[in-house]
Amino acid sequence: MTFYRDRQTLACCLISMMATTALAADTSHEHRAACVAALTTQAEPLAARLKSGDRSVQAELLKLTESGFAIIGIAYQDGLRKPQADQLLDTAKKVQKSMPPPALSQLQARCQIEGEQVLADANALERFLVTSAAERRVKRIAEKHKPVRDGS
């Protein structure tokens, strides 16, 4: 009788752990989407400055882009794909529009650190892929700058 009860208890514990793990996975996707949205919001004014010719923001924009891409890479490795990722990102952007600026700044700082840590923990190939993609993105943004020609 106790063996049967022990098996039931073990089965309940396993089911509970599996449900908790599934819930944690969903939460982590939401967290990653929130981070990507926060980093994108932080990067947008820098990208605008770079497009207008201000090269002084290029290094900072590259770091933000690398952090965002690293977080996207982890979400992809965990099975998140485009349709669901886009939906989570849209939701995160909407939520962040109503966040007080200090809370958004804190989220952005935490997410940048998290992205940097993900990149530091990545293997050489993963780091290469993320940094190369980020460099290409920032280069494309910089190339959108059209120098102002003066009439002389």
Regions found by a protein language model. Give the residues of each.
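The N-terminal extracellular segments of secreted preproproteins, especially immediately downstream
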Residues: A11-C12, A34, R110
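General secretory precursor processing signal
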Residues: I15-S16, A38, E114
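Hydrophobic helical h-region of N-terminal Sec-dependent signal peptides
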Residues: A11-I15, A19
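Sec/Tat signal peptide C-region and signal peptidase I cleavage site
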Residues: T20-D26
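Short N-proximal segments of mature Sec-exported proteins
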Residues: T27-G79
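Bacterial N-terminal signal peptides that target proteins for export
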Residues: T2-A11
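Secretory pathway export signals and precursors
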Residues: Q8-T9, H31, L107
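Compact alpha-helical subdomains of small soluble proteins
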Residues: F69-S152
